């Protein structure tokens, strides 16, 4: 493997050249004491979880310089049988371990071998947890060095830090998923890592070795030794950033506002791109032209030419991303402008960034430049990183502070070898590290007060590079935050694709909400601190010996006093919110109460206003006193109050948001309060949400955009775009400025998808009869399909009740049924569902859309209840107050679109087939039921008595299996 192929895209050439010589230099370079008497270790186990699995092999080697001078290898006899998949992975059989020592005996022998020396392991937390779970394991060593984390510091630009990847790249012994072979590989990689550390900027090793000396950190001796090889070197982050940015230059772009019309390919040229042997065929040799895809590409091309908008519903299989990428790329290249693509999901963004755009760039003469742009909190703040590395700020994590030091080292190395980039791929343990210590928000950015602003900053550098790229890929969240920030986050992009557009109204409402949160307020006041902690304390220490300190300290004392009063006052507000939350009806875990006329006229609200007004007054006093301190100090020592200025703006925002909600007269908003019923305290919030997102988009965003392509597989209700056009404001800007297009899927839904309506399920208000009938449908469906069933619930209570009834019956039948329990990871549930072909899942909102499981993994989707918003939902209540027939205009089409999204989980490829079961009796008892059925991708459905569903599914399954 070539180094060029092993590093991340955009790696500077000087870094590639350095990495290319590491293996040779590792053969001759010496590192004295830090490679004498160190132990390299690896283990094999029966599984990943230390709670449920055991050791089956331990291997270790003692290093002295470049030589292995002693070995330790043993199988371990587990109490359980080795799973078949582990045997397949490792080749370790039950016969191999039958006569092996017990875990206690093996670990005791290991402890004798190690003799307290430092232990190196790749992902050391895993090996250490298994070793120390055995009696006597804690005696093996006090010093464990994780070579995985160290590799991220030493080689931050590698595309992967897996041991097998690095061993192959640097010509070390190969990895075979056996402990002894992995140890041999790591022995070679270890020396490469030491050499790579010496290539980092001069003085960095000393900076890392010296930071926060009170924190025990296993890497400190390594960095200290390497620093001693180059004594007296002083590290400059600013100079390191300047070095890495030398070659980072880009051409200026034209603002599309300056162009009277775009130069675009003809319709015939676009058609040729999708023809056999054309551009797309060169990207994908097995590509077959699709009429629907060509029609969409032509529609996108025409929209760009005319400067108008399009709403395109493209069914599954159309290939919509390639349909818009080609004309948008041509628009960017031919006009020297930047175009934008906004997605909802990371999966689609990754598909564009790492697959489709690179392939497209390879086939276009002159290439194509593209980049991803994320929110501020995805990028490291160099000012905060510098202060943390110098020990100028406290480590705020409540977990192991050593993880924070490791994060500093990883990020510092990365920014010294990367012109751009973000935190998401660095492998930092954010559960143990306080992310805000390393990031900033747009409203908190110090800008001109920051020594790295603008060119050396990764946040502003990313924005600058985006402004010079042909194509920018971002997400819906950042797009709408940019609208709220009046264009200060994204470069001026006038041509957009909004993919996965069915969800943008909801996302815009979330991004534009004004929130007063107990948890965020607590963090805010913790950051402000007081006489001994937080930003106020830091300012006092920084100013204690400066000229004018008497004035400054007096202002600090006043700010500390007013902040303490404000903290207590806002806590009283959240106590009042919790009391008001008792009035909320419905809601299993969370109460969501509309702050409407009835509540505002109640005695409870008038009592609550006393604490609310007191808090507003206290917050305003605190805001004034903190701002006075910031202004006074900033005139002389602006760098001292940068952090305090950031927090001061948050304090002002908190006061303004509380005033807005308590006043409640701005008719653009709906007001509500939220309480977590499972907590005695904490989790309370008050929210103001924009009601009419379409109006806001029509006045604040669409006038700035020449062309917006809204694309999704789920936009129409009974073949009408009316609901979507209203939701995004296209019906407010003139009919001539936009048009809509529906493109059928290229898949045969009528043959491959069956829709079953269980019309005899009792009314859910008769809860026991309803649950009993639904239980029978669920059991029969799971048994008939042999698993691979996804059941999508609208509320947790029904889901958990039915899970306790259905799961034991599935277990007796040998079928696995999982449930989206509280605090469970949606990603792990997805992975489990996909990796176990016969497993089934009961799930909530996170699985209604964006969940792809093709083939036999998913054969049946069950929707027990239509996903109407709750009648007590604050937005629904506000709409009902303001409009007649609000339910039919908003709640009904939104529910239809959610059902369409859920149905879309079934057919993800041309060979997929499956059954959608709708078990809500309202589909046949209410007139609106037809809207759901006529909006589905297949026009036919079967109404079947619930007792016959199991038999129908057996016949359906047999018929489709014969077809295969």
Feature map (PLM): residue ranges:
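A contiguous, basic/glycine-rich beta-loop/short-helix subdomain that forms a polymer-engagement track
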Residues: 436-470, 480, 485-487, 615-759, ...
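Conserved RecA-like P-loop NTPase helicase motor core
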Residues: 746, 758-769, 821-924
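Conserved pre-motif I regulatory segment
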Residues: 264-312
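Signature of the SF2 helicase/ATPase Hel1-core->accessory helical subdomain module
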Residues: 350, 442-471, 476-614, 714-730
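Acidic, Mg2+-coordinating catalytic module of metal-dependent nucleases/exonucleases
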Residues: 115-135, 156-229
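Acidic two-metal-ion nuclease catalytic site recognized across multiple nuclease folds
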Residues: 2-30, 191-267
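A substrate-engagement module of RecA-like helicase motors
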Residues: 250-251, 256, 270-278, 336-338, ...
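Conserved non-catalytic scaffold segment of RNase H-like nuclease domains
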Residues: 2-143, 156-177
């Amino acid at each position: 493997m070539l180094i060029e192929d092993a590093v991340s895209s955009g790696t500077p050439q000087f870094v590639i050249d350095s990495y290319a010589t590491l293996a040779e230099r590792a053969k001759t370079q010496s590192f004295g004491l830090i490679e004498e008497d160190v132990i390299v270790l690896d283990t094999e186990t029966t599984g990943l979880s230390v709670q449920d699995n055991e050791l089956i092999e331990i291997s270790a080697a003692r290093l002295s310089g470049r030589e292995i001078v002693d070995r330790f290898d043993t199988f371990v006899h587990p109490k359980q049988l080795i799973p078949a998949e582990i045997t397949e992975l490792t080749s370790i059989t039950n016969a191999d371990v039958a006569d092996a020592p017990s875990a206690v005996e093996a670990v005791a022998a290991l402890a004798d071998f190690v003799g307290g020396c430092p232990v190196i392991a790749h992902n050391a937390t895993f090996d250490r947890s298994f070793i120390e779970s055995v009696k006597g394991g804690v005696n093996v060593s006090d010093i464990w060095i994780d070579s995985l984390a160290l590799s991220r510091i030493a080689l931050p630009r590698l595309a992967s830090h897996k041991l097998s990847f690095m061993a192959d790249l640097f010509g070390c012994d190969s990895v075979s998923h056996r402990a002894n072979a992995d140890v041999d590989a790591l022995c070679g990689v270890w020396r490469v890592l030491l050499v790579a550390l010496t290539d980092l900027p001069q003085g960095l090793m000393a900076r890392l070795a010296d930071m926060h000396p009170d924190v025990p950190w296993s890497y400190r001796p390594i960095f200290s030794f390497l620093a001693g090889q180059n004594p007296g070197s002083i590290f400059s982050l600013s100079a390191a950033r300047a070095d890495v940015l030398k070659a980072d230059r880009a051409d200026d772009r034209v603002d599309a506002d300056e162009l009277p019309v775009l130069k675009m390919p003809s319709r015939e040229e676009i058609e040729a791109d999708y023809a056999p042997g054309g551009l797309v065929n060169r990207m994908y040799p097995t590509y077959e032209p699709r009429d629907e895809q060509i029609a969409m590409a032509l529609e996108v091309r025409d929209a760009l030419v005319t400067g108008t908008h399009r709403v395109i519903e493209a069914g599954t299989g159309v290939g919509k991303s390639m349909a818009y990428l080609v004309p948008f790329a041509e628009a960017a290249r031919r006009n020297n402008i930047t175009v934008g693509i906004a997605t909802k999901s990371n999966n689609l963004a990754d598909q564009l960034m790492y697959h489709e755009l690179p392939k497209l760039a390879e086939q276009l003469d002159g290439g194509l430049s593209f980049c991803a742009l994320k929110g501020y909190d995805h990028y490291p703040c160099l000012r905060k990183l510098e202060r943390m590395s110098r020990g100028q700020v406290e480590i705020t994590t409540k977990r192991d502070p050593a993880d924070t030091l490791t994060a500093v080292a990883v990020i510092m190395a990365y920014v010294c070898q990367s012109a751009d980039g973000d935190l998401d791929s660095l492998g930092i343990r954010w559960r143990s590290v306080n992310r805000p210590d390393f990031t900033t928000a747009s409203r908190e950015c110090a800008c001109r007060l920051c020594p790295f602003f603008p060119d050396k900053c990764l946040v502003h550098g990313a924005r600058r590079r985006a402004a010079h790229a042909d194509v920018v890929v971002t997400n819906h969240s950042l797009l709408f935050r940019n609208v709220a920030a009046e264009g200060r986050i994204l470069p001026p992009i006038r041509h957009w694709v909004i993919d996965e557009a069915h969800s943008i109204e909801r996302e815009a409402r979330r991004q534009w909400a004004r929130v007063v949160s107990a948890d965020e307020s607590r963090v805010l006041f913790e950051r402000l601190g007081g006489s001994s902690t937080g930003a106020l304390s830091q300012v006092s220490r920084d100013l204690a010996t400066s000229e004018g300190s008497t004035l400054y300290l007096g202002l600090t004392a006043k700010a500390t006093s007013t902040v303490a009063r404000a903290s207590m006052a806002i806590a009283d507000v959240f106590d009042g919110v919790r009391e008001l939350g008792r009035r909320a009806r419905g809601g299993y875990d969370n109460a969501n109460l509309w702050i409407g006329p009835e509540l505002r006229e109640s005695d409870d609200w008038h009592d609550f206003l006393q604490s609310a007004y007191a808090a507003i007054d206290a917050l305003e006093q605190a805001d004034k006193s903190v701002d006075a301190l910031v202004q006074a100090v900033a005139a002389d020592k602006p760098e001292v109050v940068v952090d305090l200025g950031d927090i001061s703006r948050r304090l002002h925002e908190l006061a303004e948001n509380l005033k807005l909600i308590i006043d409640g007269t701005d008719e653009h908003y709906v007001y509500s309060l939220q309480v977590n019923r499972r907590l005695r305290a904490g989790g309370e919030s008050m929210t103001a949400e924009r009601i009419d997102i379409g109006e806001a988009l029509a006045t604040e965003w669409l006038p700035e955009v020449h062309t917006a392509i809204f694309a999704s597989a789920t936009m129409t209700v009974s073949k009408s775009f009316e609901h979507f056009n209203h939701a995004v404001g296209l019906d407010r800007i003139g009919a001539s400025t936009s048009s809509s297009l529906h493109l059928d899927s290229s898949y045969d839904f009528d043959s491959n998808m069956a829709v079953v309506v269980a019309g005899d399920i009792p009314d859910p208000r008769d809860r026991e009869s309803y649950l009993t009938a639904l239980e029978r449908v669920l059991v029969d469906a799971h048994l008939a399909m042999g698993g691979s069933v996804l059941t999508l619930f609208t509320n947790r209570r029904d889901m958990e009740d039915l899970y306790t009834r259905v799961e034991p019956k599935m277990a007796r039948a040998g079928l696995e049924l999982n449930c989206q329990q509280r605090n469970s990871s949606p990603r792990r549930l997805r992975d489990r569902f996909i990796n176990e072909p016969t497993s089934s899942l009961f799930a909530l909102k996170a699985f209604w859309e964006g969940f792809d499981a093709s083939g036999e993994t998913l054969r049946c989707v069950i929707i027990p209840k239509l996903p109407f918003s709750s009648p007590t939902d604050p937005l629904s209540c506000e709409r009902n107050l303001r409009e007649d027939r609000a339910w039919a205009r908003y709640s009904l089409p939104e529910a239809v679109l959610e059902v369409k999204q859920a149905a879309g989980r079934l057919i993800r490829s041309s060979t997929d087939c499956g059954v959608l079961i709708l078990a809500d009796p309202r589909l046949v008892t209410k007139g609106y039921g037809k809207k759901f059925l006529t909006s589905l991708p297949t026009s036919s459905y079967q109404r079947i008595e619930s007792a016959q569903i199991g038999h129908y599914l057996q016949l359906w399954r047999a018929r489709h299996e014969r077809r295969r």
